[in-house]
């Protein structure tokens, strides 16, 4: 996945992931969910004016690992996500409010 360079591009990528959510297998959706979380992570980091290196120090990982989180290559653990939220004063809802929308979309589309 190519990551957009600006906020609008990131939001467009997020919208694309959500629009296609119920069209894919469970394994594809897990990958897309990791991409979604990664894009939200990047969007928040950029909005706060933080570098990947600063986030890496906050999470006690390398900046390369932060890159992988942001690209959805590696899933960020819940404990690391909590560390990110606490260290950047971000509500966890910022990442997970989408789950309700996805549930609704999947239900409307007949359970798939």
Each predicted region: which residue ranges?
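N-terminal flexible/basic segments that precede or flank functional cores
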Residues: 1-33
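Short, charged recognition helix plus adjacent turn
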Residues: 2-9, 96-112
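Short amphipathic helical patch at the helix-1/turn junction of helix-turn-helix
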Residues: 35, 46-47, 75
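Short basic helix-loop element that most often maps to the first helix and adjoining turn
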Residues: 39-54, 58, 83
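Conserved hydrophobic/aromatic packing and binding residues within compact polymer-binding modules
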Residues: 41, 55-56, 66-69, 95
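Recognition helix of helix-turn-helix/homeodomain-like DNA-binding domains
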Residues: 59-76
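Short, basic-rich loop-to-helix N-cap that marks the start of a DNA-contacting helix
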Residues: 73-86
């Amino acid at each position: 996945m190519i990551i957009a360079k600006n906020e609008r591009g990131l939001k467009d990528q997020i919208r694309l992931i959500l629009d296609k959510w119920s069209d894919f297998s469970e394994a594809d959706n897990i990958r897309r969910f990791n991409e979604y979380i990664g894009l939200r992570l990047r969007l928040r980091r950029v909005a706060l004016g933080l570098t990947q290196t600063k986030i890496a120090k906050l999470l006690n990982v390398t900046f390369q690992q932060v890159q992988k989180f942001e690209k959805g290559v590696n899933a960020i653990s819940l404990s690391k996500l909590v560390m990110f939220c606490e260290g950047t004063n971000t509500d966890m809802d910022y990442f997970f409010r989408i789950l309700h929308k996805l549930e609704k979309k999947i239900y409307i589309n007949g359970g798939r």
